[in-house]
Every structure is written in C-alpha cells, then in structure tokens.
Amino acid sequence: LAGFAVMTLFYGTISDMFGRKLTMVTGFLCFSASSLGAATSDSLSMLVLWRLCQGIFAGCGMVIGMAVIRDLFGGPKAQMLMAYVSMVFGFGPALAPVIGGIVATHLSWESHFYILTFISAVLAALCLLFLPETLPKEKRMSPRLGTLLSNYASAARHGAFMTANTALAVAFLGQGVFIAGAA
C-alpha cells in the first residue's frame, strides 16, 4: 500500500510529461512483471519486495484513466464518467478478498499472482491496441525538476487541494482498516 499511496501522487505528472498511453502501458507491464516476480519468489523478503513493486505500479490505471477521461470529455459527461470509474475502483478492494478466497480455496497461493500477471498483460495489450494517445506532444509538460518541484509545492500550499486530499486519505484509511479487519 505504501508504494501505491506514494506513486498515485506522481502518475498524473509522469503522464503529463510522457503521454497517457506510454505511461499506462508501461505501468501495466511493470505490474505484470512484479506479479510474476511475486509468484516466483523463493523467500519472504523477495515476496515483500515484489509486492512493493506491485503497489508502485498498481495506481497507474486509476490515475491515468481519470486523466484520459479529462482529456476526452468535459463538463457533466466527464463528471459522470469519473464517478463511474471511481465506483468501479471502489468495488475492487471490497471484492478482492472474496475472489481471493475463492481462488485460494481451489488453487495455490502463487496462482493469485499468475492471474494478476495475465490480467495486467492483457490490459497492457488492450491499451496498446485500442487506447488513443489523448495528450498531444505539444501539450505535454517539460520534465524539468525545478518545474516539477514548483508545481508540487504550489499544490501543497493550496488549501482546497490539501483539504480534499486529506478527506480522501481518511476515507482510504477507513477502507483499509475495514479490509484488514476482514482478512
């Protein structure tokens, strides 16, 4: 979860610099590789390392998916689509333990990671084949470190941004406590 929490702050910026499609495909492929690494781990420390890598790459689809919606749509249509996407991502943590329990009952623990390897590789292929690049090169952000730091500092000083993110953090914390208690 630590990798996921930290990297969701950066995927928007990364995709603003390198494009939505490249960032999303790369994220899905890296998640797939991390899942395969977890499945083939021969020690607990390697499993934890691969799980951290999974967390780092897990947030790319959610964050960049929202950016793609924002690129393609505006106004009420964008709001409606973002609400649908948020709802789907909200169901994931609730359904995952149920699906995981069913898989664990019938297959080995490694099978969870093989399934995730396959699903994320398929998602990468689908993005590669069907997702248009929604951020043209002329609209991309320059990858200058000073500009990046300045943008993040500006966001950190923005009261409404910090309030909204604190509310989201508390909501996810509550969800995390619920899921941990259910496990």
Residue ranges and their predicted role:
Residues L1-L9, P93-A94:
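Residue-level signature of mid-helix packing/kink "hotspots" within the transmembrane helices
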Residues A5-L44:
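Conserved MFS/SLC helix-loop-helix module at the cytosolic interface between two early adjacent transmembrane helices
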Residues F28, S32-S35, W50-R51, T117-A124:
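A generic transmembrane-helix signature of 12-TM secondary carrier transporters
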Residues S45-R51, T163-A164:
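Short hydrophobic/alpha-helical segments at membrane-entry points of transmembrane helices
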Residues W50-F89:
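Cytoplasmic helix-loop-helix junction between adjacent transmembrane helices
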Residues P136-A164:
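Juxtamembrane intracellular "pre-TM" segments in multi-pass secondary transporters
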